[in-house]
Structures are given as C-alpha cells and as structure tokens.
From Swiss-Prot:
InterPro entries in UniProt: NodA, Nodulation_prot_NodA_CS
Species, as recorded: Mesorhizobium japonicum (strain LMG 29417 / CECT 9101 / MAFF 303099)
Name this polypeptide is given: Nodulation protein A
Enzyme class per UniProt: transferase
Entry's family note: Belongs to the NodA family.
Protein localization: Cytoplasm
Organism taxonomic ancestry: Bacteria, Pseudomonadati, Pseudomonadota, Alphaproteobacteria, Hyphomicrobiales
Length: 197
C-alpha cells in the first residue's frame, strides 16, 4: 500500500526553527545507518550537511517528515566548461518507507526545475544506490554517468585535511531540463567549486 504523503515546496528562508529541528531528526535517523558520522553532521538542529539548499521538497505523512530533496543552483565546471545546474542533494526517505515507491513521488521537483530554467540538474550518489536512482532513469527523466570524478570543497576548514576532496567512486545523476543530454559537456572531472549539497 502506498503511503499518503503530502508535499511541501519551500524556499530556505521560509523554514522556521521547528522545521529545522524536525528535518535534523529526520536526517539523523535516515543517514546514521550508513555510518555514525553521516548522522552526526545533523546534530544541533542542523538540517543541511554541506552547502545549504535554497529550495526543498519535503514529503510529510501522519508520522512527520517522510522524504526530502534539496536543490541549489550553482555553476560547476565539467571538464573545461562552466555550466549552470540545479544541484540535487540531501535526498532521503524515512527508513520505514523504503521500498514503498515513495521515491517516484520525488518527481514533484521536476516541474520546479523547469520553472527555474536551468539547463540541467545534477547530483552524485554512492554506487550502492545505483538501483535506487535508476528508478528516475526508467521514466527517461535522468541519466547515470559513471567513471566521473567530482571535486568539492570541505564544508568546514580542517587543519589536518586539504581544502578540497575528490570522489572517485560516485555515480553522477544528470537530468536534462532546458537542454538535451547530448549537450552535457564531455569530461571526467566535475568541479563543484564549493561543498556538496
């Protein structure tokens, strides 16, 4: 049975403290099973991990936050080409709803991407999530690119780490919005020029 989820589209400035606290708890519970540090970054009411989203789609059911997807418009560099994208990140589905088809409802974001007029949306995920994100590709909304490295800055300054990191083991998800996929630049390195969303 598909859960009854109501979707809320909100700009970051519209969120109030109770919203951040509820989202922080949601992210801790959603991300902790993938590693203790992954959940720890959401302590203290923090509802973002790296870059802060400008727009969020939040799904609610009778138990609270059921799903979330964040969006941030930014310029990235693909190979030698600067490219405006809407980065998608902070994706999560409450663990008790995994496998119930709620991920398909995240397509609520697609009309928003069209309204924003960006040429592409992009995000990166661990290879373990290939089957999960491939659901978006079945409808023809997205493409998965492998063999692409993504360079990002750390969200904070760490004295024992360089200021940037390169993820060699990620899948890049690209959604053609205002352009066709054939117009996505060739390149094996994407430079975020900032922290991951």
């Amino acid at each position: 049975m598909r859960p009854d989820v109501q979707w809320r589209l909100c700009w970051e400035n519209e969120l109030q403290l109770p919203d951040h606290l509820e989202l922080s708890e949601f992210f801790r519970k959603t991300y902790e099973p993938t590693g203790a540090f992954n959940g720890k970054q959401f302590e203290g009411g923090r509802s973002w991990a790296g870059a802060r989203p400008e727009l969020r789609v939040i799904g609610y059911d009778v138990h609270g936050v059921a799903a979330h997807l964040g969006l941030l418009r930014r310029y990235i560099k693909v190979g030698d080409v600067d490219l405006l994208v809407a980065e998608l990140g902070l994706y999560g589905v409450r663990p008790d709803l995994e496998g119930l088809g709620i991920a398909h409802s995240i397509s609520v974001m697609y009309p928003v991407l069209q309204q924003l007029g960006v040429p592409f949306a992009f995000g990166s995920v661990r290879p373990a999530l290939r089957n999960h994100v491939s659901r978006f590709c079945r409808k023809g909304l997205a493409n998965i690119l492998s063999g692409v490295r993504v360079r990002s800055t750390h969200p904070d300054v760490y004295l024992d780490l360089p200021p940037t990191r390169v993820d060699d083991n990620v899948l890049v998800l690209v959604l053609p919005i205002g352009r066709s996929m054939s117009e996505w630049p060739a390149g094996t390195l994407i430079d975020r020029n900032g922290p991951e969303l």
